[in-house]
Amino acid sequence: MSDYKFTLNLPETEFPMRGNLANREPEMLERWTKDGLYQQIRDSRIGRTPFILHDGPPYANGSIHIGHSVNKILKDIIIKSKTMSGFDAPYVPGWDCHGLPIELKVEQKVGKPGQKISAAEFREECRKYAAEQVNGQREDFIRLGVLGDWQNPYLTMDFSTEANIVRSLSKVIESGHLHKGVKPVHWCTDCGSALAEAEVEYEDKTSPAIDVAFVAADSKAVAAKFGVSGYSHPVSMVIWTTTPWTLPANRALSLSPELDYSLVEFEKDGVTQALILAEVLVESCLTRYNVESHTVLGSAKGAAFELVRFNHPFLDFDVPAILGDHVTTDAGTGIVHTAPGHGQDDFVVGQKYGLEVANPVGDNGVYKPDTEYFAGQHVFKANDNVVALLREKSALLNHVAYRHSYPHCWRHKTPIIFRATPQWFISMDNHGLRTQALKEIEQTQWIPDWGQSRIEKMVENRPDWCISRQRTWGVPITLFVNRETEELHSDSVSLMERVASRIEQQGIQAWWDLDAAELLGDEAEQYRKVTDTLDVWFDSGSTFSSVVAARPEFHGHGVDLYLEGSDQHRGWFMSSLMISTAMNGKAPYKQVLTHGFTVDGKGRKMSKSIGNVIAPQTVTNKLGADILRLWVAATDYSGEMTVSDEILNRSADAYRRIRNTARFLLANLNGFEPAKDLVAVEDMVALDRWVVRRAAALQQEIIEAYEQYNFHIVTQKLMQFCSVELGSFYLDIIKDRQYTAKQEGHARRSCQSALYLISEAMVRWIAPILSFTADEVWQLLPGERDAYVFTQEWYQGLKSVTLATDLSDDYWQQLLTVRNEVNKVIEQARRDKRIGGSLEAEVTLFADAALTEQLTHIGDELRFVLLTSEAKVLPLADATSEAVETELASLKLLVASSTAEKCERCWHHREEVGTIEAHPTLCTRCVTNIEGDGEVRLFA
């Protein structure tokens, strides 16, 4: 054997079987950085059509989690695949750097601004803290193999970006969308600030649910509206609320104009009383009040009670009954307690009737000193006292604990309140912003498409956007307001540009350091500087202008794609849409793609308390980033993305299949020089031409899947190709030819050429997903090439050639099916100990006429396809009783152990072994391959 071993073309490669990714990937990253890989990619696409994916900035606080990884990897896959398609696709990562979470972290270290530290010093500490957080997150993102301009990211706290955010606000003002108003807004008493819609989370909370009677100022007149004359008992309207603390701010009772209301009389505790309730809710209400018998005295429409007065249950004034479309009969009494200072619907209907917007509650959630009964009490703690006072005043009909969904602060996880405060708003309707935004939504492609209806509903129903915050660390609302009239300075837009120029040089502190006289001169005494800061959603929502329109690498090209988690419909997608539409009359994006949240194997959210958190850092240190990237790509991101150790281990198994395929390809390209050894597709052995044709068709499918952002389809097709067409068929068949054919002969070079073309294509297919592995493969491929696969385009060398004499794809598919049947029978023979390996087998195929014609077409080469030493085809009618039936009605099989001698070199059992004097242990084919011109293969 040792004499002939050196005549074989044994596979050889430096590409290791084990990826050892956790150790090797950091080494590759060092090389990428040293070589300036990102800039190489940029240089390779100068002058090409731009594709702009704008990075939604993560918040610069804390370590990245698995959701961050999903987001950044998806973006990286898109950028790399678009680059492979020839686009100039820059990637500028960004960070959101202002806002409350950073303030809270800094407060823990240095205290609140204005106490131990000045506001200016506090802002500087916030800036330092955010920079530290950015550096930590940046290293983690780079470790994932995400390529981008990491040395020049955009930060919302960059002086230039802060200045451009101010400029964006000035354009919104110039377009007439800004107004100041006293409105109820989401208010966190722990933050002491208004919250944006996106900063509100809904959690279950137990609240006191109470039914409260408001006695009519003139009961006799109210009863008369029900057709009851001369009524002598008190008549009350009843409200139901879960916020007793808002009753001091009650200024009306709202009814539905077309709803039927009943006047219901009953006796309880010796007292006769009459209540007004929605007709459809009478039974449920009286059950709550433990009323066993009652009389309905009459019925009337809600419209009959407009402006009728009712006494406040514990304050010394009366309130009107008013009409509103927001009144429903889903729960309660059909009559709504209306406090314009503590509810959006209440405020809107209150404006219609000119009601006072009462706000007895301070920033900290404590009643103001002039609040009767409850001064100095925190609103949530006052609930019990309100209930007790109502009971004392005989106005309480029912009181129970009620579990319901209630808004909470996203940061403190504590219940929030609605509270009327003076704030700055972007109006949804004054200048048609809502209408135009809805039109722009229709012009945008939403992926998945349900995203469109989701954001449409949000835009249809959202209130004006409160953009002001009472915080220290944020971009200032750089406005001057007249001290007497509260009007904006008439030259606000040009003044804002002058302020922006200063911020560009000195950062946001320039506003607080600014003496108004420097800009306003003699007018300075008439105006005051606004001290509010912008909602951070304005910061990130304006980056299409403050960043994309400003940075040269974007070439002034609009944004093609926004890609974030599905929570961003009400967050970044919404704020960007509002600002862009207000500024430019159009959406800032052409496509919006959303991905689902990550959950564990049981569908639960990641939670430290549950102990099911999977940190990306742990995954990369143990399995490698390419395993994490493969999991992301292989998961359908349109729904929840399930991840667990078991799932990641399955990804590692799938990765090994791809790696082993790549290793086989590289090992069998040993000694192949494309410049001199490449066989034209037209001249290849038929099977080689078929596999190149399959690869060419697959490449089109893969490119299409990348273009549609269906990365799970890419991985499915890639795995199918590696496992079935290559692994179970082509690579299995060509091993014999590759190892035993004459080294320089056509049979081997044809095979190597096919392997080379597939390798060139496949390394590009996997590069957007398995970036580290693709780079590793690229460095070992034969032939002259650029330094990195990432500067390449999809491979053009795959030719889909079909000669007139060629066997069709259907033919090879049929042969694959036949081979699978043969393998089953051989495997059974091995289990029965009738043969060892498949080369010990002689197989007889009993086939019908049509199949016989196909099988005999390739003559003696059929045995190479079946991996047997002999393959005979006989008529189906000649099948013996020992022949095994298959899943093909046209085929029966008989396997026998070969009686011929085994060739020492190729291991085939052939009759001629022992008959060649010079090489008594070889078959004729092997002698031809080592001494002659080499065997001729036409088909396989």
Swiss-Prot record:
Localization annotation: Cytoplasm
InterPro entries given in the database record: aa-tRNA-synth_I_CS, aa-tRNA-synth_Ia, Anticodon_Ile_BEm, Ile-tRNA-ligase, Ile-tRNA-ligase_type1, Ile-tRNA_ligase, M/V/L/I-tRNA-synth_anticd-bd, Rossmann-like_a/b/a_fold
Motif ('KMSKS' region): 605-609
Short sequence motif named 'HIGH' region, residue ranges: 58-68
Keyword annotations: Aminoacyl-tRNA synthetase, ATP-binding, Cytoplasm, Ligase, Metal-binding, Nucleotide-binding, Protein biosynthesis, Zinc
Catalysed conversion reaction: tRNA(Ile) + L-isoleucine + ATP = L-isoleucyl-tRNA(Ile) + AMP + diphosphate
Binding site residues for L-isoleucyl-5'-AMP: E564
Alphabetical list of Pfam families matching this protein: Anticodon_1, tRNA-synt_1, zf-FPG_IleRS
Cofactor(s) needed: Zn(2+)
GO MF annotations, alphabetized: aminoacyl-tRNA deacylase activity; ATP binding; isoleucine-tRNA ligase activity; tRNA binding; zinc ion binding
One GO CC term on file: cytosol
GO BP field: isoleucyl-tRNA aminoacylation
Main location class: cytoplasm
Binding site for ATP: K608
Sites where the protein binds Zn(2+): C903, C906, C923, C926
CDD domains per record: Anticodon_Ia_Ile_BEm (cd07960), IleRS_core (cd00818)
EC number: 6.1.1.5
Cofactor binding, note field: Binds 1 zinc ion per subunit.
Domain notes: IleRS has two distinct active sites: one for aminoacylation and one for editing. The misactivated valine is translocated from the active site to the editing site, which sterically excludes the correctly activated isoleucine. The single editing site contains two valyl binding pockets, one specific for each substrate (Val-AMP or Val-tRNA(Ile)).
Family stated for the protein in its record: Belongs to the class-I aminoacyl-tRNA synthetase family. IleS type 1 subfamily.
Subunit organization: Monomer.
Protein purpose: Catalyzes the attachment of isoleucine to tRNA(Ile). As IleRS can inadvertently accommodate and process structurally similar amino acids such as valine, to avoid such errors it has two additional distinct tRNA(Ile)-dependent editing activities. One activity is designated as 'pretransfer' editing and involves the hydrolysis of activated Val-AMP. The other activity is designated 'posttransfer' editing and involves deacylation of mischarged Val-tRNA(Ile).
Protein name: Isoleucine--tRNA ligase
Taxonomy of the source species: Bacteria, Pseudomonadati, Pseudomonadota, Gammaproteobacteria, Alteromonadales
